[in-house]
From Swiss-Prot:
Binding site for Ca(2+) 1: D49, D51, D53, I55, D57
Binding, N-acetyl-beta-D-glucosamine: N338
Protein name per Swiss-Prot or TrEMBL: Salivary alpha-glucosidase
Entry-linked Pfam families: Alpha-amylase
Reaction equation(s) it catalyzes: Hydrolysis of terminal, non-reducing (1->4)-linked alpha-D-glucose residues with release of alpha-D-glucose
Keywords for the protein's UniProt record, in alphabetical order: Calcium, Glycoprotein, Glycosidase, Hydrolase, Metal-binding, Secreted, Signal
One GO term (biological process): carbohydrate metabolic process
Main location: secreted
Signal peptide start and end residues: 1-19
Gene Ontology cellular component terms for the protein in this record: extracellular space
Tissue: Saliva (at protein level). Proximal lateral lobes of the salivary gland (at protein level).
Keyword Calcium: yes
Length: 593
């Protein structure tokens, strides 16, 4: 037995019962609030409209936030709510200290924060440090060359060719296509923008700017929030000038000959620079200032679409801790509608193998930048993936609507408003548009799915909302939402909170894992990725389990046994594209620790 302060979560490798290599993952016996947290992302424009303008707002969130507590959520993360011209829907901030008027007032925010505190929900805000809006006062002052703001952004005079013609400082390409450099007539220099030209990059090689952004964090921490999700981290730093010049990036050799496409280059100079990790550590020091005051842990969650070894590096080290939760996007980037059980296991192990010792895993299946689970991975597998999300060891993150299996809504070119898509053309915009995954939340079968009473909403409500909505699923005997709620409730039991973890694949398509606590019992989770029903060889895969009769805790809708019934695992067959959670208690102490 390990000491009480340490539990081993054993990840068994291989495709059979032939041995395993254990991977120890530290868990404190007395869990901190976030260590087994269930987090939920709200996209504020799309959650609930309280004033009838067709746009979600803070009062709407406050009015409906009890729903999140009801479905078993611990922490809520809000996408940006700060003052913005909305060229990138809040990721272009013109005042880091003010609330966007469409969303409400500072008083509305404080009311929301108080409501969250009163019902035990932890509130997380987006922090967008890479850039501001070009309408930010600091950019205006920087463009005019006024100190101390002159070097708050990244400026360069460019390069003169033999004919005296001025060109951008380097060949760097924006994430949103085209040159990452924009000429300013006022300053007579180029400024860097890794995203839109209206989103100039901040200069983190300027200590005054670094302190400015730390003060932004302190302002919101003083409002009582529990932490930050930090946006677009790989772009925070670029390589430094060499002899007054920036190095060009090499051609990628990928399947594009479009020089405006960011995939045209390999981003050796503009992504994943080593200084980024130290900056995250500095931000961790800021939130730790507040933790030290009252012994309530404030957390950092990081967003970085990059190689897994870079993602996990954001955990930091014992000497220089970083993010408690560097988002794990492996289940998003590595899985498709055609993925097999082995593909799923490979995605899981790609993260657990890369994690540093003592770190806590997290699992993310969707967000505002990626197609919804039901559309990307298959409607039939929506419950299967939510079962996995809630039963794998570690932290779970759910994007609004995934609990009811919302789907992407097709949006025409004429109605498209996402800048990533608008920078493309009618033939290719769907490859880039994120509008389909940001449609209004489907509360009911009423007007605009209960989201708003406006004549027109900011994005159209998805087709099929009359059948697919919260009210209908709460009323149904079985539903995606009720399965989700069964899972979140059971997740708080010791078997899922503390249980050792042994993972198996059976053939190509059946995944099984066992979570167990000595003296308490065990849980077996089975996920059938195959096209045919699958038997569950529990006894052979997990020697020592003994009993063949197990209690059903939750299952996919197409799986027949309902929660609370018992099945004989020797006889039962799990339906295709389905998951099931089975329990056997051997003791009585399965309550939360």
């Amino acid at each position: 037995m390990p000491p009480l302060g340490v539990l081993l979560l054993l990840v068994a490798l291989g495709h059979s019962t032939q041995g395993h290599r254990p991977l120890p993952i530290r868990k404190a016996h007395k869990f901190d609030w976030w260590e087994r947290g269930n987090f939920y992302q709200i996209y504020p424009r799309s959650f609930k409209d309280s004033d009838g303008d067709g746009i979600g707002d803070l009062k709407g969130i406050t009015q409906t936030i009890d729903y999140l507590k009801t479905i078993g959520i611990d922490g809520v993360w809000l996408s940006p709510i700060f003052k913005s011209p909305m060229n990138d829907f809040g990721y272009d901030i013109s005042d880091f200290y003010a609330i966007q008027e469409e969303y409400g007032t500072m008083e509305d925010f404080e009311e929301l924060a108080a409501k969250c505190a009163s019902i035990g929900l932890k509130l997380i805000l987006d922090f967008v440090p890479n850039h501001s809006s070009d309408e930010h006062e600091h950019f205006r002052l920087s463009e005019e060359g006024i100190e101390p703001y002159k070097d708050y952004y990244i400026w360069h005079s460019g390069v003169l060719d033999a004919n005296g013609t001025r060109h951008p400082p380097s060949n760097w390409i924006s994430v949103f296509r085209g040159s990452a450099w924009q000429w300013s007539d006022k300053r007579q220099q180029y400024y860097l923008h890794q995203f839109q030209k209206k989103q100039p990059d901040l200069n983190y090689r300027n200590p005054a700017l670094v302190e400015e952004m730390k003060n932004v964090m302190r302002f919101w921490l003083n409002k009582g929030i529990a932490g930050f999700r930090i946006d677009a981290l790989p772009y925070l730093f670029e390589s430094e000038e060499v002899d007054g010049h920036y190095r060009d990036e090499p051609l990628s050799g990928q399947a594009t000959d479009d020089p405006d496409n960011p995939a045209y280059l390999t981003h050796t100079e503009t992504k994943d620079q080593p200084e980024t990790y130290d900056m995250v550590h500095q931000w961790r020091q800021v939130v730790d200032e507040y933790t030290a005051r009252d012994n309530f842990t404030r957390i950092i969650l990081t967003e970085a679409y990059t190689a897994v070894q870079n993602m996990t590096r954001f955990y930091g080290t014992p000497a220089a801790p970083g993010a408690q939760i560097p988002f794990n996007f492996q289940l998003i980037t590595l899985l498709t509608v055609n993925s097999t059980g082995r593909d799923f296991v490979n995605a899981v192990q790609s993260w657990t193998r890369a994690m540093p010792s003592g770190a806590i895993a997290n699992w993310v299946l969707g967000n505002h930048d990626n197609s919804r689970i039901a559309s990307r991975l298959g409607v039939a597998r929506a419950d299967l993936y939510n079962i996995a999300l809630q039963t794998l060891p570690g932290i779970a993150v759910t994007y609004y609507g995934e609990e009811i299996a919302m789907v992407d809504q097709w949006i025409s070119w004429n109605d498209t408003i996402d800048p990533a898509a608008c920078n493309a053309d009618p033939a290719t915009y769907e490859l880039y548009s994120r509008d389909p995954v940001r449609t209004p939340f489907q509360w009911s079968n009423g007007t605009n799915a209960g989201f708003s009473n406006a004549s027109r909403t900011w994005l159209p409500v998805a087709d099929g909302y009359r059948e697919l909505n919260v009210a209908a699923q709460l009323a149904a005997p079985r539903s995606h939402l009720k399965t989700f709620m069964q899972l979140t409730a059971y997740r708080k039991r010791r078997l899922l909170a503390e249980g050792n973890f042994v993972l198996r694949t059976v053939g190509r398509d059946l995944v099984m894992y066992k979570r167990s606590v000595p003296g308490v019992g065990y849980v077996v989770v089975a996920l059938n990725f195959g096209p045919e029903p699958a038997t569950l060889p529990v006894a052979s895969q997990f020697p020592g389990t003994g009993e063949h009769w197990l209690k059903v805790i939750a299952s996919s809708l197409q799986a027949q046994p309902q929660a609370g019934t018992w099945i004989n695992t020797r006889l039962y067959k799990l339906a295709p594209d389905s998951g099931i959670v089975l329990e056997r208690l051997t003791g009585r102490n399965d309550l939360m620790t």
